[in-house]
Amino acid sequence: MERSPGEGPSPSPMDQPSAPSDPTDQPPAAHAKPDPGSGGQPAGPGAAGEALAVLTSFGRRLLVLIPVYLAGAVGLSVGFVLFGLALYLGWRRVRDEKERSLRAARQLLDDEEQLTAKTLYMSHRELPAWVSFPDVEKAEWLNKIVAQVWPFLGQYMEKLLAETVAPAVRGSNPHLQTFTFTRVELGEKPLRIIGVKVHPGQRKEQILLDLNISYVGDVQIDVEVKKYFCKAGVKGMQLHGVLRVILEPLIGDLPFVGAVSMFFIRRPTLDINWTGMTNLLDIPGLSSLSDTMIMDSIAAFLVLPNRLLVPLVPDLQDVAQLRSPLPRGIIRIHLLAARGLSSKDKYVKGLIEGKSDPYALVRLGTQTFCSRVIDEELNPQWGETYEVMVHEVPGQEIEVEVFDKDPDKDDFLGRMKLDVGKVLQASVLDDWFPLQGGQGQVHLRLEWLSLLSDAEKLEQVLQWNWGVSSRPDPPSAAILVVYLDRAQDLPLKKGNKEPNPMVQLSIQDVTQESKAVYSTNCPVWEEAFRFFLQDPQSQELDVQVKDDSRALTLGALTLPLARLLTAPELILDQWFQLSSSGPNSRLYMKLVMRILYLDSSEICFPTVPGCPGAWDVDSENPQRGSSVDAPPRPCHTTPDSQFGTEHVLRIHVLEAQDLIAKDRFLGGLVKGKSDPYVKLKLAGRSFRSHVVREDLNPRWNEVFEVIVTSVPGQELEVEVFDKDLDKDDFLGRCKVRLTTVLNSGFLDEWLTLEDVPSGRLHLRLERLTPRPTAAELEEVLQVNSLIQTQKSAELAAALLSIYMERAEDLPLRKGTKHLSPYATLTVGDSSHKTKTISQTSAPVWDESASFLIRKPHTESLELQVRGEGTGVLGSLSLPLSELLVADQLCLDRWFTLSSGQGQVLLRAQLGILVSQHSGVEAHSHSYSHSSSSLSEEPELSGGPPHITSSAPELRQRLTHVDSPLEAPAGPLGQVKLTLWYYSEERKLVSIVHGCRSLRQNGRDPPDPYVSLLLLPDKNRGTKRRTSQKKRTLSPEFNERFEWELPLDEAQRRKLDVSVKSNSSFMSRERELLGKVQLDLAETDLSQGVARWYDLMDNKDKGSS
């Protein structure tokens, strides 16, 4: 066959290549052979393209060398060059991975069926949903519709961004006034729906669709801020996830659907290919951070429990409830343990294999919990409980991931997933679940809690929860959903300006906030908030309407949740009048409470057999008109979870330095000093130290105690003032966060005084946690006497917590009229009054009170029940010594009032306050180290008694004083004294602890007291005396006395100690029970001594 000049040999049909399907598949012109007919000269366009490619390559390499040259020119280290090179390589790797992922995803979507046939042996997760799950259907017809609409959707997006979003961005910040969208293209690759699954829904008036969507688009959106020559944008994006669409409610008019709700059941996966300045987000580290932030933003409005609601008809009812419906149920997740975990810790470069430090992450939707870390354990025991709200069944999954805690990056140990539908079917699921991606198993107990719309079983649930040990939080008995709708006629700001109202809703220590609605006093929020409740009978909902600055309060509302328990179906849907607001200011809310009930045959609610009055029903005289049985009378109280969780904060105000001088004399010509004192404020209490005259470096050494709770946000406020005749001058202030002390347990710091040129304050703060054991009480009393200062009140040895629940069978007025009773609780000089319950003989108070106890052996709780406007209905005196011998130092039962009519149900709980920084905690181990006789004198710390470094000496002293090897008391008894010289304050200190085995001369025991006299002086200036104890042979005093004198003078003195008793009520004569005289020259006062001394008669007064 004749060929034209320039043609090569004709290829055979078998060798004939198919025509490329895409123009980009054509070989480049630069690589084509020259046409022979053209004289062997290359084509012009091909040569120009090759030259341009060479120049471009050379320019790029030159640009890479420019930063290296600049680094050398300015003298930077080669490390900066290497660091920049590492950043570039990391960025390049992330970019290549994203582009490779985009190409693979586009190839999959372009020919899904062919690729599916080729990849049948690929992993299950790479297959489309319609292959993986037989009940998921293909929806090609829907994809064709989306592809047809896609260009018009792009036009709408371009218009929306240019006309709505861009002006909003320009108005948000002055620096963005030149912000504009330069390019908005959704591209030619539309969103694809891989599979569709239809559910019938919970109710007949709704339809559920699960759309398995996959978007691998060539979208390109570019923005520019012309003022700063800044360009950024997106070029390519991937989004994969399951989108649930709910058509609800179905109605009888067009369009037959009232609204469409959309949300992702689980977090979708997102991958964005950035351009321009946003290329920096592809740097390793920033890439994961930016993707996480974007996913958090998407989850905030489009991942359960959040959803997007699109109403299709006007005036749709219950829009807020459609946007935030009630949960389907609650799952209580008990994370118990794990076993057989893999070991990730390696030592000596991997030669020695260690264990792991495992912790677990528990997720359900956007709800995430983290367990504590168990160090060095492959079979950890967590024993933690979490409660999660389940909104959609089926669909949501419980996910547990186990990690090994490391200083740098935590190692993955495995994960497990479980559909919540299986928990719903089983009600209680307790099993070991294998970990995927690792080795080992995790032990979970999963309980499905149903939501009940009546309070019939609330007492049963509370009784069960009371016996359940749960951490980190107590189990919940109910949930509360608050639908915040709108407010009316809120007060205006100063200058009659419209406020920007927002709402804070709080239950105990949980606070949630609404969005702010700007420039209106009639805001509409339409938001929902959810709370877990431990005891709905006693908790309250606190609502604060504020301006968005949080400084101006527009109104407040406190709503006891007990009101909901009597409302129909536990729902309140109404207007609420606001206090501290305008006369017509009100708030519209819908409150829905649901009781959490575990309906399982495994659960047996405990009862107390033999409880007196548990079923106190008068069968002979039933009440007429009652169709239900009388409720059982509870045997024990049911306080809320916060009862008994208080701490005591012990505040040592020690000294200050470099205070400013405020005193002036002669019209300011002569500069004096200051007379400083300290004021403290915490938890609604205030304290004040004594005044130190004329001193810029004062020492107070005072101790204050206050009962505190772990409510966040509390601060100890400390202010220093100069005492003056007219107005006290300010010397500075400082603050300490209470959570810092509660978490650490101890804080000893010099705090810089604020708002003044100079000055600092030395504080020592200690958290005392009550312990339910009396084993350490004696040591606590002794240590308190040692650290007691002369200017401070007596330190507390225990904390008494009282929970007043109710009373029954109180006496009536003349006839059958009920009283309005209330109760008063008194311990020492502290008292608490409960609220008044009107017109009842069986009041329910549900109140608690706490008291500081200084001498638990002698103090008592005095309770009186009174009627408003009448006298005492009954009283009760409870000696605290009964609590000291009770189990766990607690009494929880019915007490009969002294009047004989009426009973009260209360819980009295005592906790011993043991200081962790005085050495008392080690006393239980001290007997094994004590072998010295009574004649040996253990050393005492010569420093001030509050210094924590004296703990070993203090522990040694307690060991010898209370040693069981001590000699028996003499015929007249013994007195226990502690003596030392406090060198920093130049004081001789003596503590009279008590006496034992005193002599009884008459028929009745004596009323002893101790008198101390510093000889040779016999005047009132050196005489000290304890309080008097009634009718006892072993009195306890624990009282401290001080004498100001130099050490050398103290060593020349003698201390005369006399134990006396009043002989009769009418006589001034004192009976001497015994005495002892101590020669201080023979005592090492700098080290100190503490011991028992035998009492002698008046003829033989020498020390022994």
Swiss-Prot record:
Residue numbers carrying N6-acetyllysine = K817
Annotated segments matching region Required for phosphatidylinositol 4,5-bisphosphate-dependent location at the cell membrane = 1018-1025
Q: Tell me which residues bind Ca(2+) 1.
A: K344, D345, D404, D406, D411
Q: Which InterPro entries match?
A: C2_dom (IPR000008), C2_domain_sf (IPR035892), C2C_KIAA1228 (IPR037752), Ext_Synaptotagmin_C2A (IPR037733), Ext_Synaptotagmin_C2B (IPR037749), Extended_Synaptotagmin (IPR051634), SMP_LBD (IPR031468), Synaptotagmin_SMP (IPR039010)
Native organism: Homo sapiens
Give the protein name, as stated in the record: Extended synaptotagmin-1
Q: Which SMART domains match?
A: C2 (SM00239)
Regions crossing the membrane:
39-59, 63-83
Q: Which positions carry Phosphothreonine?
A: T948
Extract the ranges annotated as region (Disordered): 1-48, 617-641, 924-950
The UniProt-reported impact of D406A is: No effect on translocation to sites of contact between the endoplasmic reticulum and the cell membrane
Question: What residues does the C2 domain cover?
Answer: 312-433, 460-580, 627-751, 777-899, 971-1093
What does the subunit comment say? Answer: Interacts with ESYT2 and ESYT3. Interacts with ADGRD1; inhibiting the G-protein-coupled receptor activity of ADGRD1. Interaction with ADGRD1 is abolished when cytosolic calcium increases, relieving ADGRD1 G-protein-coupled receptor activity. Interacts (phosphorylated form) with SLC2A4.
Coiled coil (residue ranges): 91-116
Where Ca(2+) 2 is bound, by residue? D345, D357, D404, D406
User: Which keywords fit this entry according to its UniProt record?
Assistant: Acetylation, Calcium, Cell membrane, Coiled coil, Endoplasmic reticulum, Lipid transport, Lipid-binding, Membrane, Metal-binding, Phosphoprotein, Repeat, Transmembrane, Transmembrane helix, Transport
Q: Which gene encodes it?
A: ESYT1
* Annotated ranges, domain SMP-LTD: 135-313
Q: In which tissues is it expressed?
A: Widely expressed.
The entry's localization annotation reads: Endoplasmic reticulum membrane; Cell membrane
Q: Does the keyword Phosphoprotein apply?
A: yes
Principal place where this protein is found? endoplasmic reticulum
Identify residues that carry Phosphotyrosine: Y1009
Protein purpose: Binds calcium (via the C2 domains) and translocates to sites of contact between the endoplasmic reticulum and the cell membrane in response to increased cytosolic calcium levels. Helps tether the endoplasmic reticulum to the cell membrane and promotes the formation of appositions between the endoplasmic reticulum and the cell membrane. Acts as an inhibitor of ADGRD1 G-protein-coupled receptor activity in absence of cytosolic calcium. Binds glycerophospholipids in a barrel-like domain and may play a role in cellular lipid transport.
Topology with respect to the bilayer: Multi-pass membrane protein; Peripheral membrane protein
